[in-house]
């Protein structure tokens, strides 16, 4: 995923936190805000130390990024997403993580497709 598609600055994270709409399931919390002036969506990730050691957290981040990248064409372009991983996601498979990402994005009414 290109760096222009990522939320990196703490100020940008705070904007999403403060003006957010949120949805959660057992594995993820998703905060999102609409940004009509944007040309593409942006993604911010947060994986706490409760998820596991550093290599576990990086593994989870990679799986989330890959899942979002596969859904890129079905996401609106004018949105900032902040995905927070809960500890239950630590030892799950890539397929399961993608299913849960799809589930939480549908709950948030963000995903445009019915099923993938």
From Swiss-Prot:
Matching InterPro entries: Ribosomal_Su5_D2-typ_SF, Ribsml_uS5_D2-typ_fold_subgr, RNase_P
Domain of life according to the entry: Bacteria
GO cellular component annotations of the record: ribonuclease P complex
Enzyme Commission no: 3.1.26.5
Principal EC category: hydrolase
Coiled-coil annotated residue ranges, if any: none
Gene Ontology terms describing biological process: tRNA 5'-leader removal
Keywords of the record: Endonuclease, Hydrolase, Nuclease, RNA-binding, tRNA processing
Keyword ATP-binding: no
One Pfam entry name: Ribonuclease_P
GO molecular function, one term: tRNA binding
Catalytic activity: Endonucleolytic cleavage of RNA, removing 5'-extranucleotides from tRNA precursor
Function: RNaseP catalyzes the removal of the 5'-leader sequence from pre-tRNA to produce the mature 5'-terminus. It can also cleave other RNA substrates such as 4.5S RNA. The protein component plays an auxiliary but essential role in vivo by binding to the 5'-leader sequence and broadening the substrate specificity of the ribozyme.
Record HAMAP family: RNase_P
Subunit (UniProt): Consists of a catalytic RNA component (M1 or rnpB) and a protein subunit.
Sequence similarity: Belongs to the RnpA family.
Protein's UniProt name: Ribonuclease P protein component
């Amino acid at each position: 995923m290109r760096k222009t598609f990522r939320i990196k600055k703490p100020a940008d994270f705070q904007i999403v936190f403060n003006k957010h709409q949120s949805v959660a399931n057992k594995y993820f919390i998703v905060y999102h805000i609409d940004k009509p002036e944007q040309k593409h969506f942006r993604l911010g990730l947060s994986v706490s130390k409760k998820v596991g050691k550093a290599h576990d957290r990086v593994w989870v981040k990679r799986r989330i990024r890959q899942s979002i990248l596969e859904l890129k064409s079905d996401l609106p372009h004018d949105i900032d997403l902040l995905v927070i991983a809960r500890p239950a996601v630590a030892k799950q498979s890539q397929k399961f993580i993608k299913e849960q990402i799809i589930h939480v994005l549908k709950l948030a009414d963000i995903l445009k497709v019915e099923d993938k």
